[in-house]
């Protein structure tokens, strides 16, 4: 028969069972094992001795009942006082000789520790077993009370800590704006707002983004810009689903879906959802342009327009299409371009089923239904409903102008080839009211049809009083085989200086007899045998102009007779 006793192991605080072989007739054993007490109630073991687990216990003998009467002499006496466990100590001991921790539960009915159920969580049991620790934990302090706000607004009830804050707030109800900008005259209700506004004129941008280095003149603008780096857009439009990084941007966007527009323009009664948008719109009526370009001096009514304009000098195109790679200087142009790839046409005509990708295209299309033609040609006054139609129409004038310039150049080249000389202009050879379709210089060709050879000026009036561009009357020039008749009396024209004009106003009168002219300088009768006076500037100097037969004319006169008319 085998029995187990608890003995103290040298070098170890706890007790360990020792199994010995006993005879069945041993006197030490109680013949009735049922009377054995499993655990003695009189001796109170040391808690340190209980906080161990035997390392060499055979699992098959775990259910053996220890015998309390054969305790080791070194064990504590039954009357010894147990030591109170430290409430702050750990509920289990991690001795290197111990296999694992044994949880100890504080019995609420006693002051001793007893082995507990191994299934109990040691951490939770340790927390629940030491109510003294909870009592000594620091108490949670209440939140400090907010400072009092004794100054309340009588209009809206808002409270302020200082009277100055209330005074500034009441200006929002009264509309008082005592702080005026010396540059543009704009007024503000707060001095800090004026200081930020003046940065627009001075170019100061004290608020800089730490991520990209971009600077802004307003702190609120910087806060809105930061959401572009994080990509977080928690505010979604309930109408179209568009997301925004700030609630204020969503509120502004909701007004595009038919929201309230409380800010009305006093000039045209147009409504706006924001007061800043109304101020920008008023500049279209006043013509104010407070934002000049530092490179070219061009001024703009909005700072955003100036920034977009400055990209024309720097050639900066920061907005690139993800589909085709095309870059743009403005984000709005990129948005319009993206509709080419997506096929989106959000602007529908209310009169027909046609839709457009841009609002400007819809406005031009509406002119088709209304009949309005706001685009007018500056040359002919013709009006069109679309700007593209006016552009196409202007090409008609450009082609006509090019043709007229080519005809004038050809006529000038022909006149230069005749060598009429500097004193004979084409305008002096035309009668009053006569129009030539060959151009202003084409009339100079008329001189060769009157018997003038190229390079000569036959029959030029030698009278120094006559104009340098006058020609003799063709009827006074005798032809071969004809009689020479006396010169008819000229009829004075409306020009007060008769005989000194260019000659086309002197018309012969066959009904009147020849009467001596009272003019002291009458036109001399031509010589029956005229001799050409050589032109010192003509390359054909010394040649005689050939005479034409009666009733004949040069070929070019016959060909151009329809253009020159019967008087040519």
UniProtKB/Swiss-Prot annotation:
Protease as UniProt keyword: no
Biased composition (Acidic residues): 20-75
TM region positions: none
Matches recorded under InterPro entries: C2H2-ZF_Transcription_Reg (IPR050717), Znf_C2H2_sf (IPR036236), Znf_C2H2_type (IPR013087)
GO cellular component: nucleus
Entry keywords, A to Z: DNA-binding, Metal-binding, Nucleus, Repeat, Transcription, Transcription regulation, Zinc, Zinc-finger
Skewed-composition ranges (Polar residues): 482-492
Position of the signal peptide: none
MF terms (GO), sorted A to Z: DNA-binding transcription factor activity; RNA polymerase II cis-regulatory region sequence-specific DNA binding; zinc ion binding
Function summary: May be involved in transcriptional regulation.
Name of the molecule in the record: Zinc finger protein 358
Lineage of producing organism: Eukaryota, Metazoa, Chordata, Craniata, Vertebrata
């Amino acid at each position: 028969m085998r029995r187990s006793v608890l003995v103290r192991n040298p070098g170890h605080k706890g007790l360990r069972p020792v199994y010995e072989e006993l005879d069945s007739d041993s006197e030490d054993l109680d013949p009735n094992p049922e009377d054995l007490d499993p655990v003695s109630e009189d001796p109170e073991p040391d808690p340190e001795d209980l906080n161990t687990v035997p390392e060499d216990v055979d699992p098959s003998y775990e259910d053996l009942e220890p015998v309390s009467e054969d305790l080791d002499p070194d064990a504590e006496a039954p009357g010894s006082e147990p030591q109170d466990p430290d409430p702050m100590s750990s509920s289990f001991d991690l001795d290197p000789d111990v296999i694992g921790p044994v949880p100890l539960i504080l019995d609420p009915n006693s002051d001793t520790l007893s082995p507990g159920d191994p299934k109990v969580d040691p951490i939770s049991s340790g927390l629940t077993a030491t109510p003294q620790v909870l009592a000594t934990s620091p108490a949670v302090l209440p939140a400090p009370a907010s400072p009092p706000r004794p100054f309340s607004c009588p209009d809206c009830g808002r409270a302020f800590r200082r009277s100055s804050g209330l005074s500034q707030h009441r200006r929002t109800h009264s509309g008082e704006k005592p702080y005026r900008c010396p540059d543009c005259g704009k007024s503000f209700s707060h001095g800090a707002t004026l200081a930020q506004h003046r940065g627009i004129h001075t170019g100061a941008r004290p608020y800089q983004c730490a991520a990209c280095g971009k600077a802004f003149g307003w702190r609120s603008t910087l806060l809105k810009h930061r959401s572009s780096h994080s990509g977080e857009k928690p505010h979604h439009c309930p109408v179209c689903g568009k997301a925004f990084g700030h609630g204020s941007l969503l509120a502004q966007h909701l007004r595009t879906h038919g929201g309230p527009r409380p800010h009305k323009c006093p000039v045209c009664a147009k409504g706006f959802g924001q007061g800043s948008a109304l101020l920008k719109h008023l500049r279209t009526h006043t013509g104010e342009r407070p934002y000049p370009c530092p490179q070219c001096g061009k001024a703009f009514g909005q700072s955003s327009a100036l920034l977009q304009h400055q990209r024309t000098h720097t050639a900066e195109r920061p907005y690139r299409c993800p589909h085709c790679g095309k870059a743009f200087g403005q984000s709005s142009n990129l948005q319009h371009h993206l509709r080419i790839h997506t096929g989106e046409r959000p602007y529908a005509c209310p009169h027909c089923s046609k839709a457009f990708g841009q609002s400007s295209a819809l406005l031009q299309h509406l002119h088709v239904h209304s009949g309005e033609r706001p685009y007018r040609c500056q040359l002919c006054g013709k009006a069109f409903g679309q700007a593209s139609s006016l552009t196409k129409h202007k090409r008609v004038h450009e082609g006509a102008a090019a043709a007229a310039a080519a005809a004038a150049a050809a006529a000038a080249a022909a006149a230069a080839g005749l060598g009429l000389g500097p004193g004979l202009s084409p305008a002096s050879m035309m009668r009053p009211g006569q129009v030539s379709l060959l151009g202003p210089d084409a009339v100079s060709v008329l001189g060769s049809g009157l018997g003038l050879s190229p390079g000569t000026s036959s029959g030029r009036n030698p009278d120094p009083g006559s104009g340098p561009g006058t020609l003799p009357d063709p009827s006074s020039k005798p032809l071969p085989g004809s009689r020479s008749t006396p010169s008819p009396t000229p009829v004075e024209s409306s020009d007060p200086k008769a005989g000194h004009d260019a000659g086309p106003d002197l018309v012969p009168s066959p009904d009147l007899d020849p009467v001596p002219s009272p003019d002291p300088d009458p036109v001399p009768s031509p010589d029956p045998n005229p001799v050409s006076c050589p032109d010192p500037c003509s390359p054909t100097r010394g040649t005689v102009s050939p005479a034409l037969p009666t009733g004949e004319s040069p070929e070019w006169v016959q060909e151009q007779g329809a253009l020159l008319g019967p008087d040519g």
